[in-house]
Amino acid sequence: MLGVIRNKTIRPSFSAFRFFSSAKQMTVRDALNSALDVEMSADSKVFLMGEEVGEYQGAYKVTKGLLEKYGPERVLDTPITEAGFTGIGVGAAYYGLKPVVEFMTFNFSMQAIDHIINSAAKSNYMSAGQISVPIVFRGLNGDAAGVGAQHSHCYASWYGSCPGLKVLVPHSAEDARGLLKAAIRDPDPVVFLENELLYGESFPVSAEVLDSSFWLPIGKAKIEREGKDVTITAFSKMVGFALKAAEILEKEGISAEVINLRSIRPLDRPTINASVRKTNRLVTVEEGFPQHGVGAEICTSVIEESFGYLDATVERIGGADVPMPYAGNLERLVVPHVEDIVRAAKRACHRSVPLAAAA
């Protein structure tokens, strides 16, 4: 099968971005789809595999149209066996191909953790750089509204702690398109964490983003909003929450700088610390568990590198330390909200926050 993939003749390809060239908005779903299309058209070694990525066009339609365009040799529907198809993907990467492996949810990646960690992540180091593993693991991560604990785990800090992996967390259409293209081109294994609730959201995109040559550097954060009073770091869905919080804070005289991390590993420590040295305050936001989280790592970096610049205690916002409830009213109680970010930023700026509200 791999020989067939390697020698497959690419069909003439339309440029995925042309469909959007006259538009100013693009959904995250379309951004991911177009990134896959452009990279598959440019490199015959790139192929997709996973549950329902072909005939069904992806559980969330991210791979729509790609089976028809590139054929079953490059868009492979797999059985429901994450350990099996992930192992095949890693083996294909050893062989020199560039698989993009989709998990219907990253909760299911636990079935394939041995291949992801012990094979993909460690092989380059253990071979003294002789073996590259150019593979992308992508799919849903975190809160997806009403799907329960076994479909809502946030794996950002989990995979972010593992040497040998790169971990990307897109928020906007620009992020999704540019980071996925970079991930596919990267010689190392990349974990690409998407959020279901962002798929249908539209974001403004420039002509540069729509160009087929566009990509984003891995490990570089983006300052989404400049400010002078407090730094707020966030990733994935939480970036939107942070921006909404910044708008509310502005009305109360607080200027918040919002950093979209984009990458968890490597983490853009210079951008974060430069911002904190300007604002002298820090609030980290994530939806994952509070212990050993991404926010904890960011706070540690700031304490180690910029402690003398801090005018207030660092603030961490995260999910509750419990598995995700199924009931909607309980789910709302364990995930962060805009008002949580606002209260934390006001505390950091020494503004009055009632004890009941701060609890």
From Swiss-Prot:
Keyword set, alphabetical order: Metal-binding, Mitochondrion, Oxidoreductase, Potassium, Pyruvate, Thiamine pyrophosphate, Transit peptide
One GO term describing the cellular component: mitochondrial matrix
Disulfide bond positions: none
Single GO biological process annotation from the record: pyruvate decarboxylation to acetyl-CoA
GO function term, MF aspect, one: metal ion binding
Positions contributing to K(+) binding: I135, A183, I184, D186
Co-factor(s): thiamine diphosphate
EC number per UniProt: 1.2.4.1
Compartments (UniProt record): Mitochondrion matrix
SMART domains per record: Transket_pyr (SM00861)
InterPro entries: PDHB_mito-type, THDP-binding, Transketo_C/PFOR_II, Transketolase-like_Pyr-bd, Transketolase_C
Residues where thiamine diphosphate binds: E82
Catalytic activity entry: N(6)-[(R)-lipoyl]-L-lysyl-[protein] + pyruvate + H(+) = N(6)-[(R)-S(8)-acetyldihydrolipoyl]-L-lysyl-[protein] + CO2
Transit peptide, residue positions per record: 1-19
One Pfam match: Transketolase_C
Gene3D superfamilies: 3.40.50.920, 3.40.50.970
Enzyme class (EC, first level): oxidoreductase
Keyword Transit peptide in annotation: yes
Coiled-coil stretches: none
Assembly and oligomerization: Tetramer of 2 alpha and 2 beta subunits.
Function comment: The pyruvate dehydrogenase complex catalyzes the overall conversion of pyruvate to acetyl-CoA and CO(2). It contains multiple copies of three enzymatic components: pyruvate dehydrogenase (E1), dihydrolipoamide acetyltransferase (E2) and lipoamide dehydrogenase (E3).
Protein name from the UniProt record: Pyruvate dehydrogenase E1 component subunit beta, mitochondrial
Species lineage: Eukaryota, Viridiplantae, Streptophyta, Embryophyta, Tracheophyta
